[in-house]
């Protein structure tokens, strides 16, 4: 391909980064004569195609002008060559690409460029043609800062093309299809491209609106030609569009690359996260309404970016606004708009979304009267209980498929009879009460606007029994208990951590890593799971922490030794009595660990910590039971003698790590305000650094261990 550049060759080609979002439009004017003495060749219309982008135009010459293209140049209206104009002429492909800046003049809301073609076959090259070609100025007629961007709605994406006066003529606006035979829509790209008439397009997911010199195209996410990129629960939709019109030998093309993410954001106590799957594009900038923020500046503006397995943007909640809503208590968090600009296929493409955090539970029914004597919660739900009203057909209990026991659609009423031991009902003990809790959720009868993500209503139902309740003293006749199996099966142990010393509800496996700060105790419990024998007892041997999942990895921090508290840096491990709140107290061991125990010398906190314990199971009826007893008399204590072998000792580990942060962390207050369970974002943010740190620490520990072993061998 032969190329010719005009103007300052050091000037950057701004058209290379222009957006496909622009209107592609052809606007011909009559030709004029270059200078005195040059033969006039007057043409009423430029016979090629002009494509208008946001920052540049592309001129495609017809084959009949192929002999003249070698001597084509960009000139001003007087015929003088524009020396500052940097354009690229490609004689092989018969194209000319020129940026608006320095190559056009601004005339009544459009960019006007003049090109001159000289016939090299003419004597002394005295015959010339001049064409004035125009492109509309994108967004020039309105204050809309999102002009040239895809607008993402709940079920579709849209893009608006601008006209300049005179283009949206009556033939375009008429509904008569015969008047629009010159228009067609090309969807997709390359071999997958399909050409559709307007009527065909409107039956395949497209809609067209023309008003006030603008054309808006709405595209369903399932429309013909739309490509979907998926990763986990995130989805991105893309489709290249070309709106073509041919009339009187002139060609008009409106082209755009639409891009949209339609999934709701996820919110926690500190951040709002937007997930975008991998696709052929790279993030260029973010705009929250006050100007573009380059990727290199995101951290300074409270935005964190992850690029592993797609793209994740974490927005600090200080960037969000609050909205008082009838459906959200006390308020709803949202961003008024979020514009993301990507580099894709040598162009800049943008999309605008409107992120909102889903509402928290708006209604909580708490009454001891809900609990029945036969072990159920009876709950009535009315459609008018909220504004907007509920769609009672969508009511569900927890994560189960439990259905209402009574429906009265005319009265807008349903009734649930929720079993205390089914339908996902949870329970916990508090003082002398046992508390049962479940959740009913439904969709609104009148869904929110297309932009809103707030489509679900949640209601908590809770009841409790106290020691004075008659249910506790009721005698229930039942069949005789089956005889115990001779082989009880393998014994199962678990090591769990709790939010506080009440030991009511442990952290779930999906909540790891659990975030803790210096001076915060870590409440741990070792427990036997599948035994009901009151005569067996769980006895701790040693407990320790490591920086990896392997219990044998180095370095190690001891927290319990020989069943006794381990004093390290004046922060002693503390044991907690189990009490009578559990059925078999001897099947539990509870203690807490101070996070200062993991600060080593001048080093900082070992941020990811894994806990492990070795235990014995002793039979209190056995003559050797005294061998499993624990006697702690301070530093002079000796190791406990046991009658068991190492094979009978069992090791149990936490299901996940503890993430330790320093006191100065800016996330501490936000995490504490929501409880210790808000761990996901903070943990993920430091995970990459932790993997590297853990590897270094483990390697150094192994080298130290091998060095000591070698010295011992030499001494022997």
UniProtKB/Swiss-Prot annotation:
Glycans are attached at residues 93, 316, 323, 460, 530. Residues 36-686 are extracellular. It is a single-pass type I membrane protein. Proteolytically cleaved before the transmembrane segment to yield the secreted ectodomain incorporated in the zona pellucida. It comes from the Eukaryota. GO terms for biological process: binding of sperm to zona pellucida; prevention of polyspermy. GO terms for cellular component: collagen-containing extracellular matrix; egg coat; endoplasmic reticulum; extracellular region; multivesicular body; plasma membrane. Residues 707-716 are cytoplasmic. Residues 370-635 form the ZP domain. The keyword Signal applies. Disulfide bonds join 52-135, 85-103, 371-463, 402-423, 543-613, 564-632, 618-628. SMART domains: ZP (SM00241). Its main location: membrane. The chain crosses the membrane at residues 687-706. The record marks 168-169, 638-639 as: Cleavage. Residues 1-35 form the signal peptide. GO terms for molecular function: acrosin binding; structural constituent of egg coat. It is found in: Cell membrane. Keywords: Cell membrane, Cleavage on pair of basic residues, Disulfide bond, Extracellular matrix, Fertilization, Glycoprotein, Membrane, Receptor, Secreted, Signal, Transmembrane, Transmembrane helix. The keyword Plastid does not apply. InterPro entries: Zona_Pellucida_Domain_gp, ZP-C, ZP-C_dom, ZP-N, ZP_chr, ZP_dom, ZP_dom_CS. Belongs to the ZP domain family. ZPA subfamily. Component of the zona pellucida, an extracellular matrix surrounding oocytes which mediates sperm binding, induction of the acrosome reaction and prevents post-fertilization polyspermy. The zona pellucida is composed of 3 to 4 glycoproteins, ZP1, ZP2, ZP3, and ZP4. ZP2 may act as a secondary sperm receptor. This is Zona pellucida sperm-binding protein 2. It comes from Sus scrofa. The gene is ZP2.
